[in-house]
Amino acid sequence: MEILAMRKVACSIIFLIGSALPLALHAQFTHSSPLPERIDINTASREEVRELPISTALADALYAHRIAKGYYRSVYEILEVPGMDKRTFEEIKGLIAISHPEERREVSKYILLLQERLAAEESPREGAIDEWEDLLLSPLNINRAGVDDILLLEGVTAVDAVSAVKHRRFLGSIRYTSALRDAKYLTPYGFRNMRNYIVTTDDETDERSLSMHYRMRYDHEDLWLGDEGSYSYRVDALNAELEELESDTVDNLYTSLTNAGWTPEQIYGLKQKLINEREALKVARTPGAVSNRLRFRYKNHVKLGARIVSQPGDDDELIKQYAMFTGGPFLDKLVIGNYRVTIGQGLLFDNTDEERARLTQRIEGLFGDLTDTDEFKLSGIAAEGRLAILHPLVFYSRDRKDGILNRDGTVNSYILTQPRAAFGDVFSQEDYGGELRIDLSDMLIIPLGTYVSLNAYETQMSKPLRPDTAEVDIPFDKDRLDDLNYLMMPSGDKRTYLGTSFRTVYRNVSLEGEYVSQQEHGYGYVLKALVQFNTFYVIYMKRHYGLDFFNPYSRAFSEQSKFDDTVVEKDYRLLDPLYADLQDLPIPKAEDGHYFETRYQIAQNLTITKAYVDVWRNLAYDLDNVRIQGELEYRPVFPLRFRLKQKWQVKQLPKAILATTSRTQETTLRVFALVAGDYLSLEVRYGRVRLTPNELYNGNLLMEGNYLDAAWEHNFSDFLSVVGGAAVWDAGSMSQWIFEDVGIDFLYGEGKKYYVTVKDRLSENISLRFKVRRKSTSYPHTGIYGSSNEYHYGDDVPVLVRDFTDVRDQLSYNLQIDVRW
């Protein structure tokens, strides 16, 4: 009933404001006199576009559409502009001219826009952003592209790609990209996503003998006094553990380890390891991460790339480089150095350090790698070819990996942590395998875009993997690391995986899937179905990952990572507090689930932008979980949009005797407005989590949190813009998350922050982004020993305990410079 009441109130507010604001904004709709000459809509400034005999709001929409989507290739494309009707179009059609300036002039702008895609709930991964940037520099010739080539493009489905190829076959060739509008089953959304990355002739691609792209990024962020998980917090946790390892006290960690069979030498080794980690964190206190990246391209045949990243606290820099050769008669790509491989649904192989929950789409194939991925990077040689209907991909890599070492020198687990300290490069690993894809397109009655593949890879470690709770968990304490996701990890120095994947497309329906079996262990599979129309789509995904299936390179669709909701989240239950970083391993948890997703444009001004239901089971404990989320957008007039999002989640958490249940609700209202060329947004969220009654919670069964966020962007010109944002929050006992600029920020306690970002395209080939942010967080500590102002007796000494508030202030700034020539 509470949820229903909240939804009714929110809907009432939306429609009340939506009814009043059209009148308030009516002043923008002014009319100008007819023009004696035509305006080139592709080169005109905002002020020149406003001289058209249309409303100011519609003129701004015409201009904004060009900035966001690229140059108009036909006068009829202005019909796509929100608010443009056929009558207005006929009135201004004769007043508009369409020129065809070089697309490369807009590359710097689109690269900046791509960076902002990272600030989204289901954002693309860094590797995908890199590939799309490369396609902006070297567009895809749609007249020579195959289905798999088109699927590299952002937001393009298998149905879209097949429809584009079929339409090209029907026409013989595509003269203008706008001709793809008429492709059957290609949605307007799919076409818009393609448009900035494709051309129709080789003459339109950048065929200069040599082109280069250099990027420098500097991140100055104080990780010492940050939020939970800050370096100062970690140092305190390490100091507390070191105190417990002193041998002159009773009933401490030293005693427990001795009773568990640890020798004094082994305990001393653990102590020295913790000291080394603490000192590395202190060194990393000085902020300042620097990244330098350089990419060369000789026509479309040779690509070279190199990147050096220096992180505070790490003695060794992350160095990546590759050389890629393309365009051979039977060899599509040959890569030497660092590279990425993605096969099928990512169940067998997708080497990235990034985790993305509910990822329904990924780009497949072989790519050079200059991303931040370190632990799961590949270093060696790989090739992708084409021989008739056979499309082979093979790879070999030898690289050093980070991990937790047992006392006997074996590897307990992979780990991602920063700084790497004692975990860095402790063993080496060889990975080799590949995919043999068989293209069945147009064979007999088999539809275009159909393939089946045989996939395999093998891992050889220099030190065997041997998971052992006695090497990670504090012995004899209350909480035990007894989760089967950990206990059923395989042992040994060699692992072999065999699998198959497939895809087929029929009209507006696509089916995809992948199955992988780990030799002498478990298996996993993913199935995906898509049905799409112009205003509506439905995705269904089924996944199953067995308890005894462990694949460190698996990044298939999942809701939780492997060690999420386990004891490793509690650093005080571990022999080394930094072992808590195990929860960041991006490997899917053993789960079985069903996922449904849809988008539906109900009317021109009313759209369900995205809604999904995920029902999954934690196979380690047979616990069922549900997550439901939906977002509704209402646009009463073009410059104004409201978005109301609601999330419900019921999650069961394993406990020693009986599982507990948390029930989460989040309501978010966002308002967007485009006023006189400025972009304004306002967001408010309220969240609450209801817990299962437990004496440990002292009656605190309800956690609540909220925040208010506002952002504004002003375009001073086509090249210079400034973005400003501010937020205040009271997260209570829960955590909140918020998107800003090009990333995500987690909110704890109470606080406020503001940021300013300057984006400037200094020339057609030089762009700059500078951001400064100030964040202040307060952590109230109340009722530590019951009511305030009570005496606590430690060592028979009375100490008055008072409530207090911990305040942390952070100042960070980031600079990114892109230069192309």
PLM regions: where:
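A subset of solvent-exposed loop/turn segments in beta-rich extracellular surface proteins, enriched
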Residues: 235-267, 345, 349-372, 396-428, ...
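Bacterial N-terminal signal peptides that target proteins for export
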Residues: 3-13
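Outer-membrane beta-barrel proteins
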Residues: 307-319, 369-372, 422-427, 516-522
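Outer membrane beta-barrel
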Residues: 296, 302, 312-399, 531-554
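Compositionally biased linear targeting/interaction segments
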Residues: 27-314, 318-322, 329, 338-342
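Exposed, low-structure sequence patches enriched in small/polar residues
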Residues: 280-287, 376-378, 427-460, 464-469, ...
